[in-house]
């Protein structure tokens, strides 16, 4: 057990169970789930022994955007006190983590409740509910239960709307359930949850005899008045409003679409629209033309169906508004079909609704100087957590209140008769404050639930309340497969522009933790592919895991290619929303490349032809080779080498990923030249004779006095050029991740289906996987670095443009409305006409190749000439690089072999110019390499004299170049 020492800043323990530690007045117990950047633990108050959920967020690998997300969540939760909203009880901080103490909900989330509805009658918490209100044939939940949950959801949403808050991620996984108040009073529960407020477990509406619903996870919530519009991509795809899928501005009505999808799922048992990607999802919504269909045998009432149809209007203008929703008959009228015992038990907010029904000693209210986040504490209902026999893994935790998969019981406390407490004051204690902000903890993955029928049967054997051991195993397996496909086919939680960074880190973490990559992948001769699949089914949840930023995006990955899925799912990296985290398959890639208008709110005026002269001032840039150690020659791709024909599919994938990463490294090096001229030199940093810094990084916030003597116009020029180059580098890095992700999904799919055409040994898989993992980890590190620097440069550009004369074309007052692609961003960035990454790269490659040709003719620095040629080729290949993977095999087949890396945005005539230049440089490179080979064989041969050069090498951090 962790130390009972209570401190403001919890200290990690070194005992055997590293998850146990002191968090203020709470003891953090075992892990019950893991999400993106956050691990959820069960916790207990060290004095009252009441239970909480502690979300521990790792701060070490989080970017600024995600930290703002978590800070926003904490800030919002501080001011929310409502029975149907999960409360933030306390907040504690260490140097590496921030710990959020949340209310504990024992019944899991609504998605699990619906999914396992056929076994609810066998659990003591829901046995009485099913006896009174059995689930209908042809439907999901009994309409009484549906209306009960909807009333409570509407109560919480009205509370949010009164405060101009929009949740932006309403979905069954974020709707948590607690045992009914009557189950507490009957002494059924054995775990006592800690109350966030006096009425935390007293429903504001609905029935006392049914489970209580709470909204959780406010990582995407924001203040949005009724007349305001937003444009950030947030929410879960299956429950996302079509206006968000279309990248249009939206208002609070987006939440009402999500409510409609949740209501439909409660009635039917599945979401109204399902697809393998966002584009297909939007297509199906549009194709439906607001004609919401219900299964013929579904017994839902006309009122419920009409409400769903009014909520699921594609056009937000036609969609029901909040006022009409809150005043609808389904919300305001009594629930029909109640049994006599439940008639007249509709609950309203009051002070006598204590779930325990007994007086609990309250701790004195702490003074303002007490530990941050100190709150009034009381014992509450003795509550057990529900486990579902079909699940083969731990219960999916949700923000703040996930139960563990094994009920925790306290002896001697189960059957104690409760009593009723006195009324309490309506004054609420203050929410805890936090000193620093962490990134938004990601949602926990949806773990695989149906590896095999045998695994399901074994899981049933572990539960005394499960169905009969001999009951319909085949049917249950099919049912689980169908539901798993529904859950995982499109279970990408975070759909936000900044999410690309999360996804990159997620996939890198997945590979780093995979036992297959680490050599732990083993075959079972008896169970075959299914057994092998089970070895990578769930995430690694050890407390000693070196990488803590495991996002949902990462942990959903294995399940995304499970055999039982009925969807042709694509990896999250194949979806770029005009940004990873989707062209019609990927909108984020368009924003990352073109250059990531949505990511940086950046607009572009029409680019000039890349063959024209650039406006970049003379810059010192020294070419460098990528992958110098492991590459036998410096020949670029497409050189006709016969060895390519002998490479198997995995080796080809490795080569493509490494080459794409290499091109990104070349572009990054060029961007660094621009970037370093914008960064002031630290006093302790040595300089070269030209006075230029040799540091690979070390930037800090801009100020008027830190421009190093540059004019305002020069600052704007450098910022624009650095920004477009960084964005180009990001697009190439993202593509590397896309390719690796597709390979990983393909490997998992092959293992599940047991494809006999792939005959690869475990050792070979480990070698290939390790090599890809090395590149992926490098890409992750570089992506995060470039993202931060691009944001810095963007801010620098905005600052510089504001300092320009009012009549300057680049002054913000002179930007045309149509010139900005980032109209939804808080601050738009417009780049001057002609400033494109492709043009800058072309000009630089041409300059380098010409200089190298002159040196080659004079016999000077031949090895440097080789490097210059290779770098120029790589840079031109990056110009021609397609920023999105072909969405279909037909797309790839339509391209000639030599044009598969062409960029559609480059004009055809300009493309031909680049292709000819690449061919010319390759010819010179081949001739030079032959010359170098001959010279190398001469005992006293020289590779040419080293010329004096005015080019300053671009410094790179140790290990900065892509590994092989």
Curated annotation (Swiss-Prot):
Catalytic site positions: 169
Compositional bias of kind Polar residues: 387-403, 421-437, 537-553, 943-952
UniProt region (Disordered), positions on chain: 1-22, 333-445, 458-485, 534-584, 685-707, 939-964
Annotated keywords: ATP-binding, Autophagy, Cytoplasm, Kinase, Membrane, Nucleotide-binding, Protein transport, Serine/threonine-protein kinase, Transferase, Transport
The reaction(s) this protein catalyses: L-seryl-[protein] + ATP = O-phospho-L-seryl-[protein] + ADP + H(+); L-threonyl-[protein] + ATP = O-phospho-L-threonyl-[protein] + ADP + H(+)
GO biological process: autophagy of mitochondrion; cellular response to nitrogen starvation; cellular response to potassium ion starvation; piecemeal microautophagy of the nucleus; protein localization to phagophore assembly site; protein transport; regulation of autophagy; reticulophagy
Enzyme Commission code(s) on record: 2.7.11.1
Binding residues annotated for ATP, in chain numbering: 32-40, 55
Annotated Protein kinase domain residues: 26-331
Pfam family, one: Pkinase
Protein family membership: Belongs to the protein kinase superfamily. Ser/Thr protein kinase family. APG1/unc-51/ULK1 subfamily.
Name of the featured protein: Serine/threonine-protein kinase atg1
Species name: Aspergillus terreus (strain NIH 2624 / FGSC A1156)
Encoding gene per record: atg1
């Amino acid at each position: 057990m962790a130390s009972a020492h209570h401190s403001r800043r919890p200290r990690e323990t070194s005992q055997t169970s590293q998850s146990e530690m002191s968090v203020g007045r709470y003891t953090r117990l075992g892990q019950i789930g893991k999400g993106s950047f956050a691990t959820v633990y069960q916790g207990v108050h060290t004095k009252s022994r009441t239970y909480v959920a502690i979300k521990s967020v790792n701060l070490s690998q989080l970017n600024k955007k995600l930290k703002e997300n978590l800070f926003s969540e904490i800030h919002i939760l501080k001011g929310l006190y409502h029975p149907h909203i999960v409360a933030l009880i306390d907040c504690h901080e260490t140097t590496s983590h921030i710990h959020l103490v949340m209310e504990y909900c024992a019944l899991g989330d609504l998605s699990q409740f619906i999914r396992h509805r056929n076994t609810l009658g066998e659990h003591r918490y829901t046995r009485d509910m099913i006896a009174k209100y059995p689930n209908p044939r042809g439907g999901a939940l009994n309409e009484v239960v549906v209306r009960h949950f909807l009333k409570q959801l509407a109560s919480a949403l009205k509370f949010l709307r009164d405060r101009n808050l929009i949740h932006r991620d309403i979905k069954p996984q974020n709707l948590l359930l607690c045992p009914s108040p009557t189950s507490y009073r009957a002494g059924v529960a054995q775990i006592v949850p800690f109350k966030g407020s006096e009425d935390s477990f007293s429903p504001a509406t609905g029935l006392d005899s049914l489970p209580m619903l709470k909204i959780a996870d406010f990582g995407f919530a924001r203040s949005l008045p009724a007349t305001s519009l937003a444009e950030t991509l947030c929410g879960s795809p299956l429950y996302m409003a079509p206006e968000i899928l279309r990248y249009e501005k939206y208002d609070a009505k987006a939440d009402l679409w999500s409510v409609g999808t949740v209501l439909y799922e409660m009635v039917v048992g599945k979401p109204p629209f399902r697809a393998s990607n966002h584009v297909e999802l939007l297509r199906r919504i549009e194709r439906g033309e607001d004609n919401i269909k219900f299964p013929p045998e579904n017994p839902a009432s006309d009122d419920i169906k009409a409400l769903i149809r009014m909520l699921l209007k594609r056009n937000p203008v036609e969609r029901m508004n909040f006022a009409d929703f809150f005043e609808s008959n389904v919300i305001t009228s009594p629930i029909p079909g109640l049994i006599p015992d439940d008639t007249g038990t509709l609950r309203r907010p009051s002070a006598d609704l204590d779930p325990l029904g007994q007086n609990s000693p309250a701790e004195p209210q702490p003074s303002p100087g007490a530990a941050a986040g100190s709150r009034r504490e009381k014992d509450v209902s003795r509550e057990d957590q529900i486990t579902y026999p079909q699940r083969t893994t731990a219960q999916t935790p949700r923000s703040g209140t996930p139960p563990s998969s094994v009920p925790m019981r306290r002896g001697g406390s189960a059957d104690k008769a409760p009593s009723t407490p006195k009324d309490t004051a309506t004054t609420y204690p203050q929410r805890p404050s936090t000193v620093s902000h962490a990134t938004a903890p990601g949602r926990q993955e949806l773990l695989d639930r149906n590896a095999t029928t045998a695994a399901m049967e074994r899981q049933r054997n572990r539960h005394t309340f499960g169905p009969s051991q001999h009951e319909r195993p085949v049917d249950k397996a099919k049912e689980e497969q169908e539901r798993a496909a529904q859950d995982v086919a499109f279970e990408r939680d975070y759909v936000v522009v900044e999410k690309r960074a999360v996804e990159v880190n997620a996939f890198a973490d997945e590979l780093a933790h995979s036992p297959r990559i680490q050599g732990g992948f083993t075959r079972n001769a008896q169970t075959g592919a299914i057994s092998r699949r089970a070895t990578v089914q769930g995430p690694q949840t050890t407390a000693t895991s070196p990488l803590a930023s495991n996002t949902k995006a990462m942990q959903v990955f294995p399940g995304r290619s499970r055999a039982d899925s009925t969807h042709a799912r694509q990896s999250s990296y194949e979806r770029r929303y005009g940004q990873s985290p989707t062209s019609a398959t990927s909108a984020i890639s368009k924003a990352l490349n073109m250059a990531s208008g949505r990511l940086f709110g950046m607009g572009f005026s029409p680019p000039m032809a890349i063959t024209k002269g650039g406006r970049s001032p003379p810059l010192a840039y020294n070419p460098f080779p990528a992958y110098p150690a492991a590459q036998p020659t410096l020949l670029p791709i497409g050189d006709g080498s016969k060895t390519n024909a002998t490479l198997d599919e995995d080796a080809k994938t490795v080569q493509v990923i490494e080459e794409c990463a290499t091109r990104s490294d070349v572009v990054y090096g060029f961007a660094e030249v621009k970037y370093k001229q914008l960064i002031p030199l630290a006093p302790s940093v040595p300089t070269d004779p030209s006075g230029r810094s040799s540091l690979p990084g070390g930037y800090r916030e801009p100020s008027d006095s830190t421009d190093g003597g540059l004019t305002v116009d020069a600052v704007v020029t450098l910022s624009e050029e650095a920004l477009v180059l960084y964005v180009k580098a990001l697009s190439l890095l993202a593509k590397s991740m896309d390719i690796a992700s597709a390979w990983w999904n393909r490997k998992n799919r092959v293992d599940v289906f047991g494809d006999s055409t792939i005959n690869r040994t475990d050792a070979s898989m480990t070698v290939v996987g390790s090599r890809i993992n090395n590149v992926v980890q490098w890409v992750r590190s570089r992506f995060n670095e470039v993202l931060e620097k691009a944001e810095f440069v963007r801010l620098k550009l905005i600052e510089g443009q504001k300092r320009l004369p009012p009549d300057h074309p680049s002054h913000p007052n002179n930007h045309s409305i149509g010139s900005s692609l980032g109209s939804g961003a808080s601050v738009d960035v417009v780049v001057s006409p002609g400033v494109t990454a492709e043009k800058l790269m072309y000009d630089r490659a041409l300059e380098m190749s010409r200089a190298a040709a002159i040196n080659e003719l004079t016999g000077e620095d031949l090895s440097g000439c080789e490097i210059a040629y290779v770098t120029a080729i790589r840079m031109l290949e990056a110009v021609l690089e397609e920023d999105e993977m072909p969405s279909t095999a037909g797309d790839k087949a339509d391209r000639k072999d030599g044009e598969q890396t062409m960029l559609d945005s480059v004009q055809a005539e300009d493309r031909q110019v680049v292709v000819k230049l690449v061919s010319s440089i390759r010819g010179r490179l081949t001739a030079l390499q032959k010359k170098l080979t001959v010279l190398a064989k001469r005992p006293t041969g020289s590779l040419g004299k080293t010329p004096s050069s005015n080019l300053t090498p671009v410094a790179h951090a140790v290990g900065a170049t892509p590994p092989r």
